[in-house]
Amino acid sequence: DELNDLIETFMGDLVGDEVFNRYGERFPLLIKIIDPLDYLSIQVHPDDELAQEIGLHNGKTEMWYVMHAEKDANLASGFNRDITPQEFENAIKDKSLGDMLNYEKVQNDDVFFIPARKIHALGAGCMVAEIQQTSDTSYRVYDWDRIDRFGMQRQLHIDEALATINF
């Protein structure tokens, strides 16, 4: 909350009038350091237009800067071919979605732009600084059948993803 307090006090002087007028006291960027031990969930995020249509402040576009990559580290970004929404749904049901993704090998200092509406997942051995729009909205499409500490699979958001992904 300290950053929000600074924005409230100094308003446009801190972030610029245009940014303050658009985002108010809500800082528009979120920066995370992520170092996954396994593939993260396959997910997608809405863009600003879709987010506002469903009552959210903004969408989520991301950028990953690879701080450290193990020898075989990779990530998934987009599909490896054109697919239809029906093919997407079928691949989720038969657990073959991973076969449709575009995998990219990563190296130290690589940069990846992940626009909103693009399906993606960060792989193991790929420590990144993630710079993103401030948003908590993620539509999880597939979680590799993992079980949480309560013995349950995490919730998926297939309908939301279908409405979000650019096919």
What are the functions of these language-model segments?
Residues 83-113:
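Active-site glycine-rich loop that binds ribose-phosphate moieties when present
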Residues 62-64, 121-145:
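A short hydrophobic beta-strand segment most commonly corresponding to one strand
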